[in-house]
């Protein structure tokens, strides 16, 4: 399975952009860590909400010499059951080189898969 298919409602991103993007040059607008009740549960769970301004860059060039962007939007991802996080160097413009996703075995139960998410930074993020 492609890792992005592990994300609930990934089809909304694909429908909007026509594909699953790399999120190259996307900007992290907001990152929120919270302990909250996950839908259908009374237990608290660590949750990370990520808001990215993203698009698909085309090969077409505007009159101003910039690449044309397709489907520019703010995408909200909610990651539930977060077990580990590492943050480095937050600044005024947190541009990504890519949003890397990888399916891995759950550390406590090898029969379950979990999603590893890396916000590959262009700068110190």
Q: Across the structure, where does each feature detected by a protein language model lie?
A:
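Surface-exposed, interaction-prone regions used to assemble/regulate multi-protein complexes
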Residues: 1-125
């Amino acid at each position: 399975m492609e890792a992005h298919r592990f994300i609930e409602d990934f089809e909304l991103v694909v429908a909007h952009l026509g594909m699953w993007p790399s999120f190259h040059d996307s900007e992290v607008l907001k990152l929120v860590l919270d302990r909250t009740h996950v839908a259908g549960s009374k237990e608290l769970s660590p949750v990370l909400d990520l808001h990215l301004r993203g698009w698909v860059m085309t090969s077409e060039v505007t009159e101003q010499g910039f690449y044309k962007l397709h489907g520019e939007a703010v995408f909200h991802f909610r990651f539930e059951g977060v077990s580990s996080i590492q943050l480095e160097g937050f600044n005024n413009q947190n541009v990504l080189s890519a949003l890397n996703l990888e399916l891995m075995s759950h550390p406590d139960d090898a029969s379950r898969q979990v999603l590893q998410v890396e916000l590959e930074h262009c700068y110190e993020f």
